[in-house]
Structures are given as structure tokens and as C-alpha cells.
A protein has these predicted regions:
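Conserved beta-strand elements of the Class I
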Residues: 9-11
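Class I SAM-dependent methyltransferase "Motif I" SAM/SAH-binding loop
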Residues: 14-17
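A short, Lys/Arg-enriched amphipathic alpha-helix followed by its capping loop at the start of a domain
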Residues: 23-30
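The conserved SAM/SAH-binding core of class I Rossmann-like methyltransferase domains
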Residues: 34-35
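Conserved SAM/SAH-binding beta-strand->alpha-helix loop
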Residues: 38
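S-adenosyl-L-methionine
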Residues: 43-65
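Class I S-adenosyl-L-methionine
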Residues: 62-70, 80-252, 256-267
């Protein structure tokens, strides 16, 4: 539930189903604007927070709804190459990418801070030129203090998911912040059992025992050949692979669930 007397206000871009929002609300923040174009994600977001996000953030009519005076901009934007990238790459060189829209909103609204997330491959994308351009825009064109980005794994902070992401934070020059240390791992060990739905799960989320055995056999054959195979079969005392959108095999986490049969997996995850 939103905080009545918030410590700060933030906006949530590329919101997905609301991971950023949940985290910032838990430390006293109030979300004053949300954007997410995917219709299915919008439905889940509404179920989680009671409101539907605005749509495509590249549209000027969407940007017009962003209020003034918020403190923090959050954005988990996708990794895209720039036509001109590297040390000389500037604000206009990023036009046509979703990072340009993020940077444009920062430039217009001048938030006290921003909190950006991307896949860890951003560090090496286009031989490092993409990240170099992003940092050049944030530091030199927009004037924010931006410490070197850091790759953080969610499993080191009490989340039962092996999810490595790169984080970029920045602070408005008026704050006179010159140093920033990323948090150190909390060593809070969490497993899937800590987040699994407590209520009975609908049978449509389950696979048949026969199909599961087929996957297990297929996975074993691939492993014997030295190949990886996307499906991971997880028990209550384990952690999941990174949970991402998409339908490819490497993105599936099958969880053994003993509530219906002794050997039946489910992909039902709290908040999904």
C-alpha cells in the first residue's frame, strides 16, 4: 500500500510487474508515475498495485503525464546499440533508443537521483562502447555524479533467484555527493520455499509427470554431451535461475511441488 507520508517520491519506467515499485515503497517511497507498454504486464501490475501503468514512454503524450518534483527516477531499460558510440557519443547520438527517452526525462525533470538497471552484458555490449556512451551522457551532458556501475546478484541479497544485473545510480549536482558505495551482500540465504504460494495452485500451472520425465531425460542427454539445456528443475531448498519474460527453454524454472502428486512441477511464482 502507498505510504501516506512518504520519505521521497519516485517514478517507475519500464515497470514490468512492479519490482522497483515494491522495493522503493518498502523503504518509504511513493510512486507518482508508472510506464509499461506490455499489456500482460499491465494486467499483473494492476493486480499488484490497483492501478494501470501509462503506455509507451517514447510517446510525448505519455511523457506529459509525468509530474514535476519527484525525487528518484527508476528505469530498467533494454540494452540497445547506438549509431555513434564511445567517448564522443553524446545525448543526440542516443536518439532513437529507449535510453534517449530516459535521459530526456532526466534532463527535463532534474530528479535528485536516478536508479537504472540493465542486463550484465551491457558492460561488454558493442565492445563496451554502449555503456561508455551512457555514462558520458549521464555524467557530462546531464551533469550527474555517477559512480562506476556495478553488477549485483539478487541471490546475495535474500532473493531466491540467480539474477545478475548491472546497476547505474546517479545524483544531482546540487546534492554535492562525491562518493557512493554499493551495498555489500547481506548473506541472507533465501530459497524458493520462502516465496512459494501457500494456497493450492490451479492445476493448469502443472505439468504431467510423464512430460516432466521426458524433460529430465532430455536434459540428462544434453548434459552427457556437454551441452546446456534450458529447463532447470528446482526443489524447495534451492534458488531459481533468473526469471525473465519470453518462451525459450533457458527461461523456464520448473519447481517440484508435492501438493498434488509426489512428482509434479509448477511454474507458479509469487508475484508472477
Amino acid at each position: 500500500h502507498p505510504i501516506e507520508k512518504p520519505k521521497f517520491k519516485f517514478i517507475d519506467l519500464f515497470a514490468g510487474i512492479g519490482g522497483f515499485r515494491l522495493a522503493l515503497q518498502n523503504i518509504g517511497g511513493k510512486c507518482v508515475f508508472t510506464s509499461e507498454w506490455d499489456k500482460q504486464a499491465q494486467k499483473t501490475y494492476r493486480a499488484n498495485f490497483g492501478e494501470t501503468p501509462f503506455g509507451d514512454i517514447t510517446k510525448e503524450e505519455t511523457k506529459q503525464y509525468i509530474p514535476d518534483g519527484f525525487d528518484v527516477l527508476c528505469a530498467g531499460f533494454p540494452c540497445q546499440a547506438f549509431s555513434i558510440a564511445g567517448k564522443r557519443g553524446g545525448f543526440e547520438d542516443t536518439r532513437g533508443t529507449l535510453f534517449f527517452d530516459v535521459a530526456e526525462i532526466i534532463k527535463r525533470k532534474q530528479p535528485k537521483a536516478f536508479f537504472l538497471e540493465n542486463v550484465k552484458g551491457l558492460r561488454s555490449h558493442d565492445k563496451g562502447k554502449t555503456l561508455e556512451t551512457i555514462l558520458n551522457v549521464l555524467r557530462n551532458d546531464l551533469g550527474y555524479f555517477v559512480p562506476d556501475p556495478q553488477i549485483v546478484n539478487a541471490k546475495d541479497f535474500g532473493v531466491p533467484q540467480n539474477r545478475e544485473r548491472i546497476y547505474i545510480v546517479g545524483f544531482h549536482p546540487s546534492l554535492n555527493i562525491e562518493n557512493f558505495n554499493y551495498p555489500k551482500p547481506t548473506n541472507q540465504n533465501s530459497t524458493f520455499a520462502d516465496v512459494k504460494e501457500e494456497n493450492i495452485v490451479e492445476t493448469k500451472y502443472y505439468l504431467s509427470t510423464q512430460y516432466l520425465q521426458t524433460l529430465i531425460n532430455h536434459k540428462a542427454r544434453h548434459e552427457n554431451k556437454g551441452n546446456g539445456f534450458g529447463y532447470e528443475i528446482i526443489k524447495d531448498n534451492q534458488i531459481a535461475n533468473a526469471v525473465v519474460c519470453g518462451g525459450m527453454g533457458r527461461e523456464r524454472n520448473l519447481v517440484l511441488d508435492h501438493r498434488i502428486t509426489d512428482f509434479t512441477p509448477t511454474t507458479k511464482i509469487k508475484g508472477e
